[in-house]
Each structure stands twice: as structure tokens, then as C-alpha cells.
A protein has these predicted regions:
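Viral structural modules
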Residues: 1-214
Length: 214
């Protein structure tokens, strides 16, 4: 059976000052911010997991002079270690994370302060043999039997589903000059097993904000 060998949680904190790139206009007012984590390397050694990646922070703002909307992206390096007693280099790690308390404050028109907390949840599973009693020879011991349906692990893996599609703008929409902001959210997911495969069906809701040609 598959059981948890070890699990742990760790937090990475960010408190960084970020200079606005020279090609971007001065910031007049912050509108919205978001962030995600990109993992570049997850390496297991004896008793610990080493994580390397980046925190990608996106910002939408109004320019100080023109009053137009602009966007910029900041990449903050991430280097974290999670202690997991008993794990080895060949073990498989299931890693999840959650971004908490993301805040972006303007120091002045050319500098921002970015704060965030990222909580990592790590779980290492292992296959184990479990012995179960099937009978008792002592006549003074009462025995109650019951049929139990057992399931065995057939596949333990992960995969990436890549979606590529073209969207034609409505005729009353201007042509795209610059893409400022986007958000994508999967909806109505339906997973069904097939022969040697897993069928995934659903919708991807996409929101776009862009500047058009004048």
C-alpha cells in the first residue's frame, strides 16, 4: 500500500525593493497586483528538499503623467530548504504551495516594495507491505469475517496538459497593441478514466486587458 513516509511545511518570506525599469513610465497610482511561483529545481538529498525558483509578481498601474494604464513584472529569486527526516535522493516528492499576504507598496514613482509569504507543503510517499490477520487458532477467541474490496496502486505520476488556441477579437474591438494583464481560470473540470488514459474535460476562462492602436 501507499503511505506517507514524511511530510512537512515551510514558509519563504519576501521583502524586496524593486526599481521600475527605465523603459517603463513613472508610477502614479497602483491598480492591481498578482503573483505566482515558478519552480526551476526540486532536489532531494538525505533528510531535506532543496527548492529553487522565482516569485513572479505582476503589477498594473496608472502612469504619473499620461494617465494611461501600464504593467510591469518583477522576478524575485527563491531558494528554500525543507527538512524531511528519513527521505533519500530517489524518493518522489509531492510539492504544493500557496501565496499569502502579497502586498505591493509604492515608495516613490520609480521604486516599489514587494512583500509576500509563500507556504510550501511537501509530502513524500512510499510503498509498504501491511500484514493483516486472516484467522485465529485460539478456540476461545471469537472471529468475525468480512469481505473487503482492496485497491492497488497502478499509476503514480504527473503530467502537463498544454492548451493552445487562437481567439479572434470581435469586429467592434480595436487591434491589440500591447497586452497589459491576463487571468486564466479552469472551470467545470471533469476527469474520467479511460483505457490506459485519463480523460480531462472542462473550460478555461480567460480575461485580457490590452491597449489598442489609436
Amino acid at each position: 500500500m501507499l503511505r506517507i513516509k514524511n511530510k512537512a511545511a515551510a514558509q519563504a518570506t519576501f521583502d524586496e525593493d524593486y526599481n521600475v525599469p527605465d523603459v517603463k513610465p513613472d508610477i502614479g497610482r497602483l491598480v492591481q497586483s498578482k503573483a505566482d511561483v515558478s519552480m526551476e529545481e526540486v532536489r532531494l538529498s538525505e533528510g531535506r528538499a532543496l527548492l529553487k525558483g522565482t516569485l513572479n509578481a505582476d503589477l498594473l498601474y496608472v502612469g504619473e503623467k499620461e494617465g494611461r494604464i501600464y504593467s510591469l513584472s518583477a522576478k524575485l529569486p527563491l531558494d528554500e530548504m525543507i527538512n524531511l527526516e528519513g527521505i533519500e535522493g530517489g524518493d518522489k516528492l509531492c510539492l504544493k504551495w500557496e501565496i499569502e499576504d502579497l502586498s505591493v507598496h509604492m515608495i516613490h514613482s520609480r521604486k516599489l516594495n514587494i512583500k509576500a509569504i509563500v507556504t510550501f507543503y511537501a509530502v513524500v510517499d512510499e510503498l509498504a507491505v501491511v500484514e493483516l490477520p486472516v484467522s485465529a487458532e485460539d478456540q476461545e477467541v471469537s472471529v468475525k469475517t468480512e469481505k473487503v474490496r482492496l485497491m492497488s496502486l497502478r499509476v503514480h505520476k504527473k503530467d502537463t496538459l498544454r492548451i493552445k488556441d487562437d481567439i479572434t477579437l470581435a469586429s467592434n474591438r480595436p487591434n491589440v497593441e500591447n497586452l497589459l494583464w491576463y487571468m486564466a481560470e479552469p472551470r467545470n473540470l471533469d476527469l474520467r478514466p479511460g483505457e490506459n488514459k485519463l480523460r480531462v474535460k472542462g473550460e478555461l476562462a480567460v480575461f485580457l486587458l490590452y491597449t489598442g492602436y489609436e
